[in-house]
Amino acid sequence: VLDSVQFGRIMRESGATVLYLSAGLFNQVADQLAEVFAQLRYLIVGGDVLDASVIRRVLRNSPPQNLLNGYGPTETTTFATTCRLNDLIDEGSQKIPLGRPIGNTQVYILDGQGQPVPIGVTGEIHIGGDGVALGYLNRPELTAERFIPDPFSDAPDARMYRTGDLGRWRPDGAIEYLGRNDFQVKIRGFRIELGEIEARLAALAQVREAVVVA
């Protein structure tokens, strides 16, 4: 995939019409794959915050029929919301909305007491529905912390996932991402827990204190 020329050839020869790219890879190959993008029915980009300038450039020079921002953590089967960007991004846009929940998925933005926040107010994004995983393998404490009962669902034993992502509802019904409520960062779509790195460094005999920033 890192060889954009070869990847473009494979896409053309296969006749593929749907493509998913991580945000980092999309930014890297957007110009080289312009011809491929223009032939797609769906181009889905996700895994990190999208760069509005790259989105505008693709829509201006090589727009696919549908360019989607796909949002959702692995714990909810990767995609929980989508947003079609073709007619949404203008020259002044800096933030790319996450969009609305996909089918059989519920998204709640809750305050610190677990109550829904009003439109425009920041809260933590929680995701419920059929895509929520059972939990983490051999990590019952973390499972109990992140996968919690869904009080808004009528389904028996329904649970929702606490994402740690901050967001708010826009007046148009779309969700806007506002950052994290912890020290997790993403690099090229991969989760990095800064606290885990700090703990490893602090465990070294030669280290008295450690702070990791990104």
Segments the model singles out, each with a brief description of its role:
Residues 1-97, 104-106, 111-116, 141:
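Adenylate-forming
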